[in-house]
Amino acid sequence: MANTKSAKKRIRSDARKRLRNQSYRSRVKTMIKKAELALANGIVDEAALRAAYSTLDKAAVKGIIHKNNAARRKSRLAQKAKKVALAAQAGSAA
């Protein structure tokens, strides 16, 4: 257990930061799920994708996730969106 005053304060501040980070990480997951759900239904929802990209970028800037983690997730979302768009285009052309 913490013995010094500064160590006790660090524990309190770490708890606040952990809650804030947890909340933001949850928001990131929610935005990604919304975008993926739309893609799974065959809809390229630009607004949902834009919101997911924005949330991922903000989380990376704030240090909640690593920038490469954000880039990888954005890339995978973009790949799925492209796949759905091409499938829809091929379906309408046929």
Curated annotation (Swiss-Prot):
Gene Ontology terms, MF aspect: small ribosomal subunit rRNA binding; structural constituent of ribosome
Where is the region Disordered?
A: 1-20
Task: Tell me which GO cellular component terms the UniProt record holds.
Answer: cytosol; small ribosomal subunit
Keywords for this entry? Ribonucleoprotein, Ribosomal protein, RNA-binding, rRNA-binding
* One Gene Ontology term from the biological process aspect of the record: translation
InterPro entries with a match to the protein in the record: Ribosomal_bS20, Ribosomal_bS20_sf
NCBIfam families noted in UniProt: S20 (TIGR00029)
What family is reported?
Answer: Belongs to the bacterial ribosomal protein bS20 family.
Function of the protein: Binds directly to 16S ribosomal RNA.
- Protein name stated in the entry: Small ribosomal subunit protein bS20
Per the UniProt record, the source organism is Chloroflexus aggregans (strain MD-66 / DSM 9485)
